[in-house]
Amino acid sequence: MVVETTRPIELVNHFALFDNASKQCEMFETVVAGEPNRHVQRLLSNATQIRGRSGQSGGKKPRRFSPPTRPEIVELLEDKSMLPAIVFIFSRAQCEDAVHSCMNAGMVLTSLEEEIQIREIVERHCENLTADDKDALEYHHFIDDVASGISCHHAGMIPMFKEAVEECFAQG
């Protein structure tokens, strides 16, 4: 049995909320001193008590906080110099959707130099694919996404794609 207790990259859990009042995405530690973050619990419980603009109750109350979009989360991580990052999504389809939403938002997280380096890594891992294989696997979309600094990594991907993503992530 081999046991490794050192992680090459530390895993830290955060909770993100979009504050509809300030129009800002905010990040909070999920666990503080071994307990669920009470500040987040207070924010969410107080948010349900906010009244409408007239100050009267009744009808639907506006929600103070909502889940941020995938591009908002990535922008927040970039602003806080927390990239590269892993976002855990429990559905292959949602993993793919997350990449598409970031790409559709026009996100590019790499410099020209990084893009060139990423393309070389992906091309090296996929050099044995035929042109037909590349078409069937939508290789050109994959390499463009990864070169922009955005990719998914899930069990449904071919090993070549996953290995390329892993190498890119390990290199930062």
Give, region by region, the residue ranges found by the protein language model.
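Conserved interdomain linker/interface between the two RecA-like ATPase lobes of SF2 helicase motors
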Residues: 1-103, 151
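Conserved C-terminal RecA-like helicase domain
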Residues: 92-172
